Curated annotation (Swiss-Prot):
Name of the molecule in the record: Cytochrome b6-f complex subunit 4
Pfam family, one: Cytochrom_B_C
Role description: Component of the cytochrome b6-f complex, which mediates electron transfer between photosystem II (PSII) and photosystem I (PSI), cyclic electron flow around PSI, and state transitions.
NCBIfam families in the cross-refs: cytb6_f_IV
GO biological process terms held by the UniProt record: photosynthetic electron transport chain
Domain of life: Bacteria
Transmembrane segments: 36-56, 95-115, 131-151
Gene, per the UniProt record: petD
Higher taxonomy: Bacteria, Bacillati, Cyanobacteriota, Cyanophyceae, Oscillatoriophycideae
Family named by the database record: Belongs to the cytochrome b family. PetD subfamily.
Topology within the bilayer: Multi-pass membrane protein
Self-association and partners: The 4 large subunits of the cytochrome b6-f complex are cytochrome b6, subunit IV (17 kDa polypeptide, PetD), cytochrome f and the Rieske protein, while the 4 small subunits are PetG, PetL, PetM and PetN. The complex functions as a dimer.
InterPro entries tied to this protein: Cyt_b/b6_C (IPR005798), Cyt_b/b6_C_sf (IPR036150), Cyt_b6/f_cplx_suIV (IPR005870), Cytochrome_b_C_euk/bac (IPR048260)
Keywords per UniProt: Electron transport, Membrane, Photosynthesis, Thylakoid, Transmembrane, Transmembrane helix, Transport
């Protein structure tokens, strides 16, 4: 049994749409009832089973009790705040750091308008969005890794 319906390439309307680069949603199984009644419950039950299984097999360990009089040498935020922490740590002017962080969502809001002429959903046929995504991912990883290092090695990772 296959989850995808093969397109009927003898259909002239479908061939015309595919020749224009359109028609990628023209064929396939309908969402109702196939996805909503059969696939979604399996995914939901599987997710719940995975969470319960991981909770049973590897329960969270309770750490040492907090000591308010013994602070660590370097206090780091949670891992998902490391890139933002690195921006605020490296940029000399804190207002400039906040402006840099606020410009990221504003820049991401511009990507659909830049690519509004592009009708393709394939990421290989959308070079601007793909380049923005890959550059943003690389910069985020670079900032996140750099936040865990001392300030003098944080931008170069100590390689230079």
């Amino acid at each position: 049994m296959s989850t995808l319906k093969k397109p009927d390439l003898s259909d002239p309307q479908l061939r015309a749409k595919l020749a224009k680069g359109m028609g990628h949603n023209y064929y396939g199984e309908p969402a109702w009832p196939n996805d909503l009644l059969y696939i979604f419950p399996v995914v939901i039950v599987g997710t719940i089973a995975l969470c319960v299984g991981l909770a049973v097999l590897d329960p969270a360990m309770i750490g040492e009790p907090a000591d308010p009089f013994a602070t660590p040498l370097e206090i780091l935020p949670e891992w998902y705040f490391w890139p933002v922490f690195q921006i605020l740590r490296v940029v000399p002017n804190k207002l400039l750091g906040i402006v840099a962080m606020a410009s990221i969502p504003l820049g991401l809001m511009l990507v659909p308008f830049i690519e509004s002429v592009n009708k393709f959903q394939n990421p290989f046929r959308r070079p601007v969005a793909t380049a923005v995504f890959l550059f943003g991912t690389a910069v985020t990883l670079w900032l996140g890794i750099g936040a865990t290092l001392p300030i003098d090695k944080s931008l170069t990772f100590g390689l230079f």
